[in-house]
């Protein structure tokens, strides 16, 4: 095995070896199964940290269950990501050709996207392979594959025929740049400085004496441009000021439209004037008021965000109405919305309708996709009824058929589902699943897989022109079918029968409603068990936290804090990293700031750590918290951990390569250290498996780290070196046998988290053990053996270790070189302890650099000594002749002064209110931890100074 651990030399070739030999494939169909559906990443770019994190977690689970002999299947695929992909390709086409989507036919534009998709998918799959994910690539799916598209159309048809899908004109969030409806959850609400305009609405009523007293109702609004679509003024029924006006009418400024004054509790007595203009076609709250009072709805905006030349008037049911005129003043026609606002303010000021203007803060909705202001728009869309579906999905979680891990996310899920509204499933895009609806000239609706099927089913002749619906389905609709459409539904395939329902979904809390809830609803509607009961899509939902930067900030390109997982695996120079972070910025003015931040954070670029170190870091950070702060120092530390395992394995291989250890009997007679390591490993297996079984990957990583670094390397290997050097031939052979046996099991234990390094080492170990199988990933995972537990062995070994630690501390604290051999005296030891000393005397002497070990029958009072009671036994080290007390005392006093100065500095800092108020929480915590450590050091220094002063006094 190579002397230096170099992950680059082993990882890519090893993945090719795994894939070529079909080790990732599901097999043994008669065995128990374990299946995960990978949340398909969007094809819009490369994998980010969140993808790498979640895919690592999923791969750990798949490898773990595969090694338990289960028939594992991990569905891999990518999502067509309708809006995001169309935006990206439109932008690229404009940059290259100065053309827009409208310069192409629909088919030609879609061809452009397919060309781009091939390029993007190759990047994503390459990244996945570098992460080591063990998926069967022969079953890779794309959400626009023909079989998936067939499933999506079939689902739509069934839902429509069962009266769960309908078409209706409703108010939606409209993106005027993309010219499509977007989800409520894709709207970002920003608080900005704005204005409130107070506008006079002339009162129209028969009582002229009343009119002479009050001529206007004054209404405040932050959107004066929408007054062109007003259909009522609302006042609160408890507002006595306006009771006399309820049932009367006002004239709408600029349009002279006569609209009613209505009573509704939506009008807030404490806000504005108490009067609210109601524009049902352009405000969500107004829309609800309009439905309640059966008000007309007047649409005044075009889909691209301009004032229409002719208004559209509908009744509250969304049907065309002639209740009001469709005329819009000519001077406002075709203006964009903000320009129209300016012109309308000018006109109402000129005509005397403006009362006053006030500065205020306004919450404005923006599209997360395009960045433009969202307009509430009255449009004809397709909807899925959700109330019945949601009830079944809610009960599945309540009845524990589906469990959230951590459990805290159940309440988030329940809250959303209890307040769910019908789902708008149509989008005004070209890229996506085109809705399987056709219309004839009379606007009759026909539903089917394709036009040919429809003509046959409805007996429509070729002479009748049929036109397909232009809209596509919301991306989340096809994604909601993912757990069963990817397995072949509606066909009853072997894979569908074998792997559904799946075992666990690994996802983020940010898409619990977007995707997870909808998946549960749709799956339980379409999938039924043998008793015709709704089948859940998965039994467990493991929700990961969100990966943030070291300061707790969300990673984004605009902040310049994004890290590509592959850049940590393979390394990247500073210049390349800067280029990557500043390329294609939406806000180029941020470039200098991002460059400076990058230089400060990574002055030498990012060094290669390899995949296993990255995967181990992800595992160690996978706690149950909502936010996870990325820590490059931990990544570096786990790179060192991989190196530690590599070097330890080299030591084992170098010392055992000439042997054949095909059999091992744990019951054979052996040294205490060998019995102990077997028990420790057995306990580690128990705790490790419990952690993986309960999705505590962070605990599993810490257990593995502690065993490899502290128990196996720092203790056991140090003992083994002495046995190999000084032990009898039987002791040496047995110890080497145990060494190989434990390492081979340890590699299997670590394999799910660290697949590359463990496979590489195992390929060497298997030769020594005469193992014929090709790969570690198909080996049996270590199991806990309760018969191996022996408390007596642990007590004996722990006592011996405590003595060794005590001796090491004396050398460290008193600055005694290892070349100076110490005498050790023991007093008041029991028979078991005496047995441990006698049987392991050579080990203890050599590991602690002792010249002799003496068991006393009487107390030791001859020389100045350090004594320690360890498990009832008195451990004695004479120290009078070990060191120059004056020199050592001087050194200790100097060290203490330095420590006390540092304590003073940190205390001053953490008592400073400004520091506590403005410093990041992480920095404050670090300073407090430093203080605790310095106080511990200072206490030890005081104890040592006291000892040496006593020694000087006795001399």
Swiss-Prot record:
Q: Which PROSITE patterns has this protein been placed in? A: AA_TRNA_LIGASE_I (PS00178)
Q: Tell me which UniProt keywords the record has, alphabetically.
A: Aminoacyl-tRNA synthetase, ATP-binding, Coiled coil, Cytoplasm, Ligase, Nucleotide-binding, Protein biosynthesis
Major place of localization?
Answer: cytoplasm
According to the UniProt entry, its GO molecular function terms are: aminoacyl-tRNA deacylase activity; ATP binding; valine-tRNA ligase activity
Q: Where is this motif: 'KMSKS' region?
A: 554-558
What residue range is the signal peptide? none
Instruction: Kindly give the Pfam families that the UniProt entry links to this protein.
Output: Anticodon_1, tRNA-synt_1
Could you tell me where this protein is found in the cell?
Cytoplasm
- Single biological process term from Gene Ontology: valyl-tRNA aminoacylation
Q: What is its EC number?
A: 6.1.1.9
CDD domains referenced in this protein's UniProt entry, alphabetically = Anticodon_Ia_Val, ValRS_core
Reactions catalysed, as given in the entry: tRNA(Val) + L-valine + ATP = L-valyl-tRNA(Val) + AMP + diphosphate
Q: List the disulfide bonds.
A: none
In the UniProt record, does the keyword Nucleus occur?
Answer: no
Q: Which residues form a coiled coil?
A: 926-946
Membrane spanning residue stretches: none
Among InterPro entries, the record links this protein to:
aa-tRNA-synth_I_CS (IPR001412), aa-tRNA-synth_Ia (IPR002300), Anticodon_Ia_Val (IPR033705), M/V/L/I-tRNA-synth_anticd-bd (IPR013155), Rossmann-like_a/b/a_fold (IPR014729), tRNA-bd_arm (IPR010978), tRNAsynth_Ia_anticodon-bd (IPR009080), Val-tRNA_synth_C_sf (IPR037118)
Query: Which residues take part in binding ATP?
Result: 557
Q: Which PANTHER family match?
A: VALINE--TRNA LIGASE, CHLOROPLASTIC_MITOCHONDRIAL 2 (PTHR11946:SF93), VALYL-TRNA SYNTHETASES (PTHR11946)
By its UniProt entry, which HAMAP family does this protein fall under? Answer: Val_tRNA_synth_type1 (MF_02004)
In the record, the note on similarity to other proteins reads: Belongs to the class-I aminoacyl-tRNA synthetase family. ValS type 1 subfamily.
Domain remarks: ValRS has two distinct active sites: one for aminoacylation and one for editing. The misactivated threonine is translocated from the active site to the editing site.
Q: What does this protein do?
A: Catalyzes the attachment of valine to tRNA(Val). As ValRS can inadvertently accommodate and process structurally similar amino acids such as threonine, to avoid such errors, it has a 'posttransfer' editing activity that hydrolyzes mischarged Thr-tRNA(Val) in a tRNA-dependent manner.
The subunit field of the Swiss-Prot or TrEMBL record says:
Monomer.
Q: What's the name of the protein?
A: Valine--tRNA ligase
Q: What is the organism of origin for this protein?
A: Buchnera aphidicola subsp. Acyrthosiphon pisum (strain APS)
Q: What is the lineage of its organism?
A: Bacteria, Pseudomonadati, Pseudomonadota, Gammaproteobacteria, Enterobacterales
